[in-house]
């Protein structure tokens, strides 16, 4: 099944929005597992699990009861297209399950996101949460730079503005980088919805494929240590990089030292990374 050369596009229509979910051709063992938060008549939203981790990304924050608390709490980074009600009403549900969890929730979105987050938080009384270690950051992306504000449960979610930062990858027009991780980047571009509405593209840097047959022939088990090896590749470690890994065999475990270049040569194939785009209301 040759998925690598194919694209598929699923266009979903509701009574209020034209919803486009584009998933680029992915490897047979994709790094991202994505699905819609609601059906075609519900609020727009896309939940993306980063496989083999406890991490997820959430695109838009509409009604999200279908996700449940466990999935919501995995989504430390949330990318908001705009703050119309059907894209932002789920803020309160996430806030409620995150209180007292010691988490940092990062929200990324268009101009106006910071005062809208502030307004949501000011809708409640916070005199009993001074011992709750919850931090919310909001990043607004403007043509001339990034504005950031932080809200802490320990002081009743007062607004703390941070210094502005330059926009990465853009001079005011076209795509710009919203979030960067060794494994992937999230880029955005502003569309016209009578307000700026951000469209997002999640791009894996590249995909690391392990040949399990060769690993087996070499007496090496699959397991968490391979995830660590992937991270070294995404971080750009050189071929002579040495590392130790704990290997779990059927009846024992051992710690061995490896050289990254030898792992690459014997067991690894690098292919194009997975890409997912999220576009609504334009």
Identify the residue ranges that each predicted region occupies.
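A glycine-rich helix N-cap at a beta->alpha junction
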Residues: 126-141
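Intrinsically disordered, low-complexity segments enriched in serine/proline and basic residues
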Residues: 1-10
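Active-site catalytic pocket residues across diverse enzymes, especially alpha/beta-hydrolases
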Residues: 95-98, 121-125
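Conserved beta-strand hairpin/beta-sheet module of binuclear metal-dependent hydrolase folds
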Residues: 19-72, 77, 104, 200-202, ...
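Short, conserved secondary-structure transition motifs
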Residues: 113, 139-149
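Metal-dependent phosphodiesterase/nuclease catalytic metal-binding core
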Residues: 11, 23, 161-282
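Active-site metal-binding motif and surrounding structural segment of the metallo-beta-lactamase
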Residues: 63-110
């Amino acid at each position: 099944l040759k998925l690598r050369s194919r694209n598929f596009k699923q266009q979903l229509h509701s009574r209020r929005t034209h919803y486009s979910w584009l998933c680029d051709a992915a490897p047979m063992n994709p790094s991202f597992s994505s699905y819609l938060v609601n059906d075609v008549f519900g609020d727009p939203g896309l939940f993306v699990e980063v496989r083999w981790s406890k991490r997820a990304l959430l695109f838009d924050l509409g009604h999200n009861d279908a996700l449940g608390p466990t999935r919501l709490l995995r989504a430390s980074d949330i990318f908001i297209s705009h703050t119309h009600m059907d894209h932002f009403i789920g803020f309160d549900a996430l806030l409620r399950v995150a209180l007292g969890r010691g988490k940092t929730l990062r929200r990324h979105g268009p101009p106006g996101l910071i005062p809208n987050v502030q307004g949501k938080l000011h809708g409640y009384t916070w005199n009993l949460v001074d011992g709750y270690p919850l931090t919310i950051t909001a990043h607004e992306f403007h043509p001339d730079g990034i504005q950031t504000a932080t809200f802490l449960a320990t002081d009743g979610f007062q607004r703390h503005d941070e210094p502005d930062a330059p926009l990465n990858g853009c001079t005011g027009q076209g795509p710009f980088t919203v979030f960067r991780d060794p494994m992937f980047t999230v880029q955005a571009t502003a569309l016209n919805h009578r307000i700026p509405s951000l469209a997002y593209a999640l791009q894996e840097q590249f995909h690391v494929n392990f040949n399990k047959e060769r690993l087996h022939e070499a007496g090496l088990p699959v397991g968490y240590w391979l995830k660590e090896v992937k991270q070294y590749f995404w971080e750009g470690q050189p071929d002579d990089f040495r590392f130790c890994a704990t290997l779990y065999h059927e009846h024992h475990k051992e710690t061995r030292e490896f050289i990254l270049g030898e792992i690459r040569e014997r067991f690894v194939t690098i292919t194009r990374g997975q890409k997912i785009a999220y576009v609504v209301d334009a």
